[in-house]
Every structure is written in C-alpha cells, then in structure tokens.
UniProtKB/Swiss-Prot annotation:
Documented EC number(s): 7.5.2.7
Name of the gene this protein is made from: rbsA1
Principal cellular location given in the protein's record: membrane
Name of a matching Pfam family: ABC_tran
Name of the protein described by the UniProt record: Ribose import ATP-binding protein RbsA 1
C-alpha cells in the first residue's frame, strides 16, 4: 500500500541536544498509525518538523508521493495535513461555525460575511461526523469531548487527508472516548490516514492498525498492532523489560499522622478518613466524584465550610495554599501546566519557587549557591533529563516536568504529600521512575495521598484505598480487600463500605 505521507531519515538538533536522529514515519490511507515512545523520545519534535514549525536538518518528506517541504503550519494545513493538539485551540465565546472558519469566513458579493452559507457548511461537517448538535452553538457550552469533535470538523474543513491526534482522550470521559473511536472509524472509511499519539496501551490496541516506535529520537520499528502484545510494545519503547509495573513497597505504616473528620466544602460532603506515617493512601472514583475538590479543601485551595483536621495531633486550619504549605501539606496538581508550573521560567526557578524561605538571608537576599546545590541534588535524585537547570521548563517532556513539580513540593519538607494524577500524560518508563520515587518517600516516613483515575495504579501502589462518589466517601478498603470490581462498585454508588479507624 502506498503511503500518503512518508518521513525518512529525519534529523533535528537543538543546542546541547539531538532531538531526532534518522527518524521515520509512514501514514497509510484508511489506517490509524499509532506513534509511541517515552516522553522525550521525539514524537512532538517529529510532528513539528512534519507541520513546518521546525526545519529539518536532514531527511526527506514525501507527501502524496512527491518530495515536499512545508514552510509552516499554514502550508501543511492547506496541503491537507491537520493536527489536533492536546490543548484544544478553540475560542469559547464564538460559535462552532465561527471557530471552524475563523480567518476564512464566507463572504458575499458585497464583502460581508455570508452567515447562512457558513452555518450550512459547518452543519455539513458536523453531520459527516454524525454529531447531533448544530453549528450555531457556543463552543464554551460544549463538553471537552464535543469540543474535540469541533476540532476534528475544523480539520475536515481543510479537506485533510492526514489527521494527527495528540493524546486525544486525555481529558475525555469513557463515553466521549467511545464517541471519538466511532469518529475515527468513520474517518478511516473515508480513506483518511490518522496519526494517533498516545501513552494508553489499551487505546492503541483497540483503535490502531499500525504502530511506529521512537526511542531517544530514533526510529525503532514499524509494526502491525495485531502482531504485538502490550509487553513487547513497552519493551520496544523503553529498550528493556518492565518486570514489575507497580513496584509496591511492603512496609507497615506507622502512627496516624493526618485525621480528617466530617470535612465539607465545594463538591465535598462530610468526608472522614485517616492517613498514617509512611502510608500510601489511594483515592479512587469517577470523573466529577469530588476527589480533586477534597484534596484542594484539605490543602486550602478551596474553602472549608465545616469539618475538623488534625496533623500529628494538632488542629490544622487551611484558608489558603500558604496555610497548607506552612502546616506541612503539599498538593501536586493534576493540571501541572495550569496550576503546577510556570512554563516560561527555568527548571531551577520552578523547583525552588515555594521553598525560597530556606534559601533566604535575614535581609531577604537569596543564598544562590545553596539554592543551586539543592536543585542540583534533586535533578540527580529524580533523574530529571535537562541540558541544565537554567533550561525553560516548558521545553522539557511531560515526565520531566512532573518530576520537577514533585521535587518542588518536597523542597518545602512536607509531612503530607498529595499527588493528584501524578502520571497523567507520562510515558511508561517515566511512570516507573515516579513510582520508585513514591516508594522512596514512603520508606522515609512521608505520608502520601495518591489520587488517580487509573485503577491498576491505585491498586498497585496503595496500602489502603478510599473511594469517592458524588462528593461522599463511598468505600474504604485494605490492599487485600481491593479489586477493580469492588472499587468500581463503590465508585458508581452500588457499594458503601467505610471502615473508620
């Protein structure tokens, strides 16, 4: 089968790092090509070379059989290559039609916008995707899943023959994910080629035909998905066998450190639980169950309306995140780009941001040597891959950004570490490193709350698990009691079993 798109022998270097070396990618009509690799493997760089954001240093790009060079996103888009980014590029205050045709509106012979034609054409695009809503609806009124469908419709408006989807299900519910897969099947039947970038093995084996593996900027293999197992694919990605995906540390927790009684706040209703020294407490539940809200109320990022919290026997009142930090409670957000990191600042500045008091003299000036030493120690301990501590953190891979976010929390010397979706958007190799770090914190006596939507992660890493349902605690289970079935029953409200200490 002749490829719609071929990239061969692609090289791309930046100061101090070779991002791509001999990388290759083929996209075939009517097939979905998964592009996988650890964070930092070169997937994003390859997409930027393909769409003309970066100029390649070497290699060839064949588009519909002809050697081509795209001068920028506009030229690749007009040629028929569409990309749907992880962060959606839509304007909430405009309608669907206005978003789809932004900058290329239909005009009548008087030079005015032809709204009737524009909405009719947008409705046709939505109908192609079997969507039930009309294009006069505001994008801000749509769910994230439906907004993603608008992005696909926008790509189709350019008559795109190849569509690139970057982590498309990251913020979707299970129902929205199934809708996306239905649309992908529809696009395949129209002969379009799809590049599907994802860390989620289940999705790759469900919806992709072929897979291309990158490792350290190099092309490793192209295979039919049907010829692989999850283990063999992971082995190609990381270059080694992952013997134990969730390396649980069997060490008995100590005395009760944190006690939460009848906590209430926005989205949180009468929640009570305990957390021991050197314990990993898993928090499970469906999207919207109130897990993140509970953590934010506990930390001080959301207001507490009632309830009582003690830490090491002393009452803790957190009216702001500063109160949480001052009391030894650290929260690492699920949305590191919005709440966790300052992307324009360096690795060093991000890591030491909340711990500057430890590096300050009485007059307020910084002890730069102490700060640099501490940051250097954490970079080494956490195996953060960065050319230097002065590198802008926005240029690091997702896994390395997450390590910096966790390191920043630990710099404040906390007693309780709350990790909200710590491995979201992180590849399998970096996940394993984060799990090993969590075990190290546990061994050092740190109390850890692990909030995760990945049930195997919660089951694999936790000593004890609590489950949230509609703002309430619907279950509490020991490691031995917990199974996927039991946790899911509690998550949907079919089971209510809470054993308070």
């Amino acid at each position: 089968m002749e490829a719609l798109l071929q990239l061969k022998g692609i090289d791309k270097a930046f100061p101090g790092v070779k991002a791509l070396s001999g990388a290759a990618l083929n996209v075939y009509p009517g097939r979905v090509m998964a592009l996988v690799g650890e964070n930092g493997a070169g997937k994003s760089t390859m997409m930027k070379v393909l769409t003309g954001i970066y100029t390649r240093d070497a290699g060839t790009l064949l588009w519909l059989g002809k050697e081509t060079t795209f001068t920028g996103p506009k030229s690749s888009q007009e040629a028929g290559i569409g990309i749907i980014h992880q962060e959606l590029n839509l304007i909430p205050q405009l309608t669907i039609a206005e978003n789809i045709f932004l900058g290329r509106e239909f005009v009548n012979r008087f030079g005015k916008i032809d709204w009737k034609t524009m909405y009719a054409e947008a409705d046709k695009l939505l109908a192609k995707l079997n969507l039930r809503f009309k294009s006069d609806k505001l994008v801000g009124d749509l769910s994230i899943g439906d907004q993603q469908m608008v992005e696909i419709a926008k790509v189709l408006s350019f008559e795109s023959k190849v569509i690139i989807m970057d982590e498309p299900t990251d913020a979707l519910t299970d129902t929205e994910t199934e809708s996306l897969f239905r649309v992908i099947r529809e696009l395949k039947s129209q002969g379009r080629g799809i590049v599907y970038i994802s860390h989620r093995m289940k999705e790759i084996f469900e919806s992709c035909d072929d897979v291309t593996v990158f490792r350290d900027g190099q092309f490793i293999a192209e295979r039919e998905v049907a010829s692989l197992t999850e283990d063999s694919l992971i082995e190609m990605m990381v270059g080694r066998k992952l013997e134990d995906q969730y390396p649980h540390l069997d060490k008995a927790p100590g005395d009760i450190r944190l006690k939460v009684d009848n906590l209430c706040g926005p989205g949180v209703n009468d929640v009570s639980f305990t957390l021991r020294k050197g314990e990993i407490l898993g928090v499970s539940g469906l999207m919207g169950a109130g897990r993140t809200e509970l953590m934010k109320v506990l930390y001080g990022a959301l207001p507490r309306t009632s309830g009582y919290v003690t830490l090491d026997g002393h009452e803790v009142v957190t009216r702001s995140p500063q109160d949480g930090l001052a009391n030894g409670i650290v929260y690492i957000s699920e949305d590191r780009k919005r709440d966790g990191l300052v992307l324009g600042m360096s690795v060093k500045e991000n890591m030491s941001l909340t711990a500057l008091r430890y590096f300050s003299r009485a007059g307020g000036s910084l002890k730069h040597a102490d700060e640099q030493q501490a940051v250097s120690d954490f970079i080494r301990l956490f195996n953060v891959k960065t050319p230097s501590m002065e590198q802008a953190i926005g240029l690091l891979s997702g896994g390395n950004q997450q390590k910096v976010a966790i390191a920043r929390g630990l710099m404040t010397r906390p007693k309780v570490l709350i990790l909200d979706e710590p491995t979201r958007g992180v590849d399998v190799g970096a996940k394993k490193e984060i799990y090993q770090l969590i075990n190290q914190f546990k061994a050092d006596g740190l109390s850890i709350i692990l909030v995760s939507s990945e049930m195997p992660e919660v089951l694999g890493m936790s000593d004890r698990i609590i489950v949230m349902h509609e703002g309430h605690l619907s279950g509490e289970f020991t490691r031995e009691q917990a199974t996927q079935e039991v946790l899911m029953a509690a998550a949907v409200g079919k089971l209510n079993r809470v054993n308070q200490e």
